[in-house]
From Swiss-Prot:
HAMAP family in UniProt: His_tRNA_synth
EC number: 6.1.1.21
Organism: Pseudoalteromonas atlantica (strain T6c / ATCC BAA-1087)
One annotated GO molecular function: histidine-tRNA ligase activity
Domain of life: Bacteria
Phylogenetic placement of the source organism: Bacteria, Pseudomonadati, Pseudomonadota, Gammaproteobacteria, Alteromonadales
Gene Ontology biological-process annotations: histidyl-tRNA aminoacylation
InterPro entries cross-referenced by the UniProt entry: aa-tRNA-synth_II (IPR006195), aa-tRNA-synth_II/BPL/LPL (IPR045864), Anticodon-bd (IPR004154), Anticodon-bd_dom_sf (IPR036621), His-tRNA-ligase (IPR015807), HisRS-like_core (IPR041715), HisRS/HisZ (IPR004516), HisRS_anticodon (IPR033656)
Gene: hisS
Family: Belongs to the class-II aminoacyl-tRNA synthetase family.
Protein name per the record: Histidine--tRNA ligase
GO cellular component, one term: cytoplasm
Pfam family, one: HGTP_anticodon
Localization per Swiss-Prot or TrEMBL: Cytoplasm
Record has Protein biosynthesis as a keyword: yes
Amino acid sequence: MSKQIQAIRGMNDCLPEQSGLWQWAEKAIREVVASYGYQEVRTPIVESTDLFKRSIGEVTDIVEKEMYTFADRNDDSLTLRPEGTASVVRAGNEHGLLYNQQQRLWYLGPMFRHERPQKGRYRQFHQFGVEVFGLAGPDIDAEVIALSARLWKKFGISEQVTLELNSLGSNEARETYRKALVEFLLARKEHLDEDSLRRLESNPLRVLDSKNPQVQAAITDAPSLIDYLDAESKEHFHALCERLDALGIQYRVNPRLVRGLDYYNRTVFEWVTDSLGAQGTVCAGGRYDGLVEQLGGKSTQGVGFAIGMERLVLMLQASGAEEFVASPVDVYVTAMGDEVELYALQIAESLRDVMPTLRVQTHFGGGNFKKQMKRADKSAARVALVLGETEQQEEQVSIKFLREDKPQSRIARSELESTLVELFSL
């Protein structure tokens, strides 16, 4: 026997018993973004490596350690996308969607990062995200945060997540803060790990993002970015907080929140949870007013967020959301005898013609009554249509209830559609 091929480490299969919850979550997401008037955009999985070096930043863990990068036959450097924002901006620039326009977009799809697999984190993972372009005010920041809050409400997990908020200010304000932070960190250099020392030279704000407890202890008294904000950024942040207060969205200002990508300015936020272990971020985003121009477009403001779908699904499983997932089958059609199989096939197809939302599965492979009922029960269908020679000869159908304590009944085939419409409230 040949050696069985396994999935690549960190690449996860979504099996039928899991896909129902994914589909339920994706449907809920589509309903919420539609209620805000956002439109879907789909971008390629493979992009030029330069796109991510210029957007995410060359001195980031993603670009330095985690990207799946390869040379194609033309020796061009290509990368499996590690996140969605850069691709959406690239598409917007390329197709003239952004300059002097307002766009509210969303996406959902697979991303790739070569990081250590752990609970809810895989090397191929899925992100849902929204990106808004052409609006500079705090009102749109509030809207995208409100949209994310509405998703938690839709999923029934609002009590499990906390909104953390910060402002990174303008580039000029960050540069002033950067100097103060570097001075502070240099005085505590012996307490920094190798990663933090490297970041100290290239991107000192990222030291604040360190997960090392020793580093965290050393930066407890670090200067706060909020104290260095320019007047316009302070006003923007204050106005955002006012809007969140008016909407009843609770938040906590976290002066250490800097985000792991280089393109953010002003508003940054994360929804965190303690139900997923130490790394508890389930949603993150912020404002990136310079990114469009950085990637070759004309100056256009942007703001958005992304949700890790694997982490979201873990939370939904823990909260019991699977009870809302419909069974994959409503009606299981059986055929007692080879001569009856054609009759069963005709009935199943006629039901799909008349009731396209009804999920009908037909039994194939023969077997006695007991075997077919066992398959019907395993399908999780609510009812089985029992068809034998008598039913075929008399143009009838027997209905057996699989989940309710009701007697089996026989009706005319002509009454089947109306009976099922009433039974399933179609």
